[in-house]
């Protein structure tokens, strides 16, 4: 428990300090996906709130742990009186006088039997703490998935921007060539104008692609709670994608049931519902407690001889000890209804667990089929790029030899550009889908 508490406090108190060091180094080197995820976990507000809730559950465990100990309370009082009253020190006659009374006391109470309420409250608090920790783990998983999606989106937009820039270079080369041909009368003004329009269109596409990249980088930096995206760069992934055999959905589901935070939290809360029922049932049992006390006082009265303070405290000391038994007989069916409510809550928690398992299985199935489709799409896009590269190469040679028009050349160029863009999209779609499957298998996303 102490280790858990230390971890929660570290997340709450030191996350900002640790992260600020990384933020200062944001411009020094590219960030890996793992670095982005770790940084987001340290700074995300939702995670810090969830960690705070888990820390509160830890306090509740500590409170219930010591609730079986005796309590000890002290009391002190001071009263003054004046007027006609019976004397407590002399003959007991009624006289006009003023008096002062100082009282002191200690009392304690020990619960001997509470109908098993206290041990069940302690067990419930421990299970609630475990569930709260799993809630924290789920919050970390959620931010990891969000960061992964945003990270890959940045890389995707960056590659599209590079493709757009390369298309400008190709268009400018062709414009330069057509200008040369125009000067010697081998190209028409319409062809030159069309080439100029193509350059302008490619430049506009490049500006849009670059803007998309900057916006996605801004989204990621905001997700990481970075003050600015300036100087924030990402590591480039491997050029070649390694395709591994996909684990069957049923096997992934079996693995996920053993560790998935959402499932574990639901299981802990369902287990705790048994304690909640026993806590409600404890009101059916008699309650037995032991109590004791010490009290003394110091009294003075005008016109009378008063013994010393210490003497009176000693002589007036009284002691008491007793046992209190409270037997429930009829409480307007309140206990019965509380037990019914606890059992209904248990049924609701059981349904929630069942729903969580079914939802998990559906998510794994969808992730698996999406990964299969993404792999097929990438393979198809590879073939499309190869075919369009060959077609564009042939069309370039024909255009340079004057055997094709600029329209035909431009169409081949656009087809190649689309094929390259489709391959980039398929590449990052597969990377994301495969990481989702790794996530369900309990592997660290990096």
Spans of model-derived segments:
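Bacterial Sec-dependent N-terminal signal peptides
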Residues: 1-33, 445-446
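Bacterial Sec-pathway N-terminal export signals of envelope proteins
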Residues: 23-73, 77, 83, 228, ...
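Small/polar, glycine/serine/threonine/aspartate-rich low-complexity segments that form flexible
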Residues: 24-29, 75-110, 236-245, 278, ...
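Sec/SRP-type N-terminal targeting helices
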Residues: 48-52, 65, 98, 112-140, ...
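Short segments within alpha-helical structural elements
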Residues: 52, 62, 201-226, 385-443
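Periplasmic alpha-helical coiled-coil/stalk elements that build and connect Gram-negative outer-membrane
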Residues: 142-255, 370, 374, 416
């Amino acid at each position: 428990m102490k280790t858990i508490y230390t971890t929660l406090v570290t997340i709450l108190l030191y996350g900002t300090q640790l992260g600020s060091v990384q933020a200062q180094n944001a411009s020094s080197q590219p960030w890996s996906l793992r670095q982005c995820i770790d940084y987001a976990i340290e700074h995300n507000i939702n995670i810090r709130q969830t960690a705070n809730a888990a820390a509160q559950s830890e306090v509740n465990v500590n409170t219930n742990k010591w609730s079986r100990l005796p309590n000890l309370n002290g009391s002190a009082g001071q009263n003054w009186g004046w007027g006609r009253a019976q004397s407590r020190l002399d003959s007991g006659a009624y006289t006009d006088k003023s008096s002062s009374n100082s009282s002191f006391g200690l009392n304690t109470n020990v619960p001997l039997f509470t109908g098993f309420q206290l041990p069940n409250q302690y067990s419930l608090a421990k299970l609630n703490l475990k569930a709260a920790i799993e809630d924290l783990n789920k919050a970390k998983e959620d931010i990891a998935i969000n960061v992964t999606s945003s990270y890959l989106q940045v890389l995707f937009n960056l590659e599209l921007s590079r493709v757009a820039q390369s298309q400008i270079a190709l268009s400018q080369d062709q414009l330069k060539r057509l200008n040369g041909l125009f000067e010697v009368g081998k190209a028409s003004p319409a062809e030159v104008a069309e080439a100029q329009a193509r350059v302008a269109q490619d430049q506009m596409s490049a500006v849009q692609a670059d803007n998309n990249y900057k916006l996605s980088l801004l989204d990621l930096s905001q997700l990481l709670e970075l003050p600015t995206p300036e100087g924030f760069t990402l590591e480039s992934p491997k050029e070649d994608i390694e395709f591994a055999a996909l684990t069957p959905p049923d096997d992934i589901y079996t693995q996920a049931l053993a560790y998935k935070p959402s499932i574990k939290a639901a299981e802990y809360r369902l287990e705790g519902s048994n304690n909640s029922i026993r806590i409600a049932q404890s009101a059916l049992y008699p309650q037995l407690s032991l109590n004791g006390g010490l009290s003394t006082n110091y009294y003075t009265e005008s016109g009378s001889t008063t013994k010393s303070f210490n003497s009176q405290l000693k002589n007036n000391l009284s002691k008491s000890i007793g046992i209190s038994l409270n037997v429930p007989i009829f409480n307007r069916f309140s206990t019965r209804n509380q037990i019914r409510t606890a059992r209904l809550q248990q049924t609701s928690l059981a349904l929630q667990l069942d729903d969580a398992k079914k939802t998990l299985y559906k998510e794994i199935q969808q992730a698996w089929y999406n990964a299969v489709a993404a792999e097929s799409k990438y393979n198809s896009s590879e073939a499309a790029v190869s075919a369009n590269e060959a077609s564009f190469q042939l069309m370039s040679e024909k255009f340079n030899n004057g055997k094709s028009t600029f329209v035909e050349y431009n169409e081949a160029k656009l087809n190649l550009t689309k094929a390259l863009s489709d391959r980039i999209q398929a590449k990052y779609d597969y990377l994301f889908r495969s990481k989702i499957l790794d996530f369900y298998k309990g592997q660290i996303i990096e």
